Amino acid sequence: YYLVDDAYRCGLLEGTYRSSDYERNLEALSVPSEHRELLEKWKLCGQMINAANNLLAAIEKVNDANFVGGRKKEIIAEARFLRAFAQLYLMKHYAFFWDLDSKYGPLMRRVPGTLSNNNMKRSGVRETYDLILEDLDYAINYGPGYKDVFSASKGLAKGFKVEVLLLRGTDEDYAKVPELANEVLSDYEFKLEESFENVFKNGYKSTEIMFSRFLSAKKLADVDMNVASIKKLMCGKYKPNEQFLDIFNATNDTRYALTFDSVLYEQFNSTNKTLILKKLWRTDGNCPMFYMRLAQMKLFQAEALEHNGASVADVLAPLNDLRRRSGNVLLKAEDFSDRDDLVRTIFYEIVREMGLENGAEWFAAVRMRLSSGKRLISELNPVYSDDKQLAWQIPDDEVSYNTLMEPNPVFIRE
């Protein structure tokens, strides 16, 4: 779901992969509060947050002398990063993240959960951003250096800080993004691969993967049966729709041939080939997950520069860095007489470079605005007409068992 839920909301996919109604609800920007998918994601984030809070509470009781060097602070930093990661997911999906003055932020638990503290009010959006950034700043200042793609690090925390600033979206935030993104690109252990192909050919060993997840032998044994495994996710169950293919196809971008393919996936269909997400697909099912990769910093830079009113040439520069390494024709400033076309091009490059990896398409389409003031998402998904549609509903179970939880307002089409 981390890969494709938001692509459905963006109007880029068709077909079904989890249930007969869920994908249609995503497309309609209206998943009912009783739907099990909303609860499952909410619970997974809650488990991660509670695990981090339990560790943070326990480690404070351990004498500093029991740790070598700054290891205690590093462990705290790793836990605070993971808490921020989970709370950011809640913010992006269940809260009014676009409205700093909204009271509809997520549930920001900061201590271990017990029966006595189960009832808790949700935080406001402004407070939520402050708390998430506090955790990320701690991880930047005290976290460990890069160890592997499965672990938190200073540079990873700064990468997520860049995304959080874009989401919060004040003019001051946008002004900071280009330089902060450049620091992630140049000051840490990550490195852009020389080619788009190498990002995926090198898998977990790619210098560009900033954060992924580890699959145990038990999980790998189940990849051909698990509907949520990356290996099985596409496989004829869902596929790019016409709008996606207008933006990204074999004619207009060399990355397409490295992104999609058709193979004989016998566990799914032993007779006919099926469409797969080639860039992530692995025969053994150990498909890398890209919660964030370094190329996003270039895309974040382009988005922020456009917002800041930079020249067309300056906006195109980070996009062309990615086009150059993939063997595509470079974009030229003189071809853009309309600022709206520049906004659309940034979005198209996000789809071509990062499509179906981590929901980057949706959040960019929500953030970016046309000269009319309308969100770009209004062109991509005609169902959108009101910002209340941008947030999922709080799951019914949370509202039932947490008596202080206030649900999100429901959009009602007149």
Q: What annotation goes with each model-predicted range?
A:
Residues 89, 167-171, 300, 307-309, ...:
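Alpha-helix C-terminal capping/termination sites
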Residues 298, 314-328:
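Active/binding-pocket-proximal capping segment
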Residues 19-94, 123, 140-147, 283-294, ...:
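Conserved, well-structured interaction surfaces
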Residues 174-294, 329-330, 343-345, 353, ...:
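Hydrophobic-face positions in mid-chain alpha helices that act as interaction patches
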Residues 52, 129, 136, 174, ...:
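Inward-facing hydrophobic residues that define packing positions of alpha-helical scaffold repeats
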Residues 3-10, 14, 95-107, 145-224, ...:
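Short, surface-exposed recognition loops and adjoining beta-strand edges that mediate ligand/DNA contacts
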Residues 9-32, 264-276:
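Short alpha-helical hairpin
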Residues 70, 93-130:
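Short coil/linker segments at helix-helix boundaries
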